[in-house]
UniProtKB/Swiss-Prot annotation:
Family in the record: Belongs to the universal ribosomal protein uS4 family.
Protein name per its UniProtKB record: Small ribosomal subunit protein uS4c
Cellular compartments per GO CC: chloroplast; small ribosomal subunit
Lineage of producing organism: Eukaryota, Viridiplantae, Streptophyta, Embryophyta, Tracheophyta
Domain named S4 RNA-binding: residues: 82-143
Localization in the cell: Plastid, Chloroplast
PROSITE patterns hit by this protein: RIBOSOMAL_S4 (PS00632), S4 (PS50889)
Taxonomic source organism: Sparaxis sp. (strain Lejeune 1997)
An annotated Gene Ontology molecular function: structural constituent of ribosome
Main function: One of the primary rRNA binding proteins, it binds directly to 16S rRNA where it nucleates assembly of the body of the 30S subunit.
């Protein structure tokens, strides 16, 4: 995980740790001129590791985004940002996207009153995301919300009620709120 961060830069969805400033300088000295292929590969790998996708999953999202009207890159990022695991991470209910995936896989999360155990579930506007009514589920989410440092950085397409452990998807994400810097 730390080798990936050192190579690709900060990936907030993967871990809260940041690469040291000196490690970036060493990589620049060693690398020389970066080819177009290398730049594209690094950007693709950033997407994969940040959102926790396999190569095949990313290809499916690219295919869906290519069929839709509009900029393929923007639509791809919107599709990835509207995944349930990413929305839990953005709401502060999980510290990382892999942590959010674990919450979903262990059936702690309800969407519109139904248990959803698929992290790639595509959320829609007006979806209500809550925790199960069990003490264990609420305790897990409460720990994440209490330790979440980015409470004030909540994107405008999401709202959270930390007392009821409830989040709401207001609309499809705007491109300026996407947390990952991609070329």
């Amino acid at each position: 995980r730390f080798k990936k961060i050192r190579r690709l830069g900060a990936l907030p969805g993967l871990t809260s740790k940041r690469p040291r400033s000196g490690s970036d300088l060493k990589n620049q000295l060693r690398s020389g001129k970066r080819s177009q292929y290398r730049i594209r590969l690094e950007e693709k790998q950033k997407l994969r590791f940040h959102y926790g996708l396999t190569e095949r999953q990313l290809l499916k999202y690219v295919h869906i985004a290519g069929k839709a009207k509009g900029s393929t890159g923007q639509i791809l990022l919107q599709l990835l940002e509207m995944r349930l695991d990413n929305i839990l991470f953005r709401l502060g209910m999980a510290s990382t996207i892999p942590g959010a995936r674990q919450l979903v896989n262990h059936r702690h999360i309800l969407v519109n009153g139904r248990i959803v155990d698929i992290p790639s579930y595509r959320c829609k506007p007006r979806d209500i995301i809550t925790t199960k009514n069990k003490q264990r589920s609420k305790a897990l989410i409460q720990n994440f919300i209490a330790s979440s440092p980015h409470q004030e950085e909540l994107p405008n397409h999401l709202t959270i009620d930390p007392l009821q452990y409830k989040g709401l998807v207001n609309q499809i994400i705007d491109s300026k709120w996407i947390g990952l810097k991609i070329n």
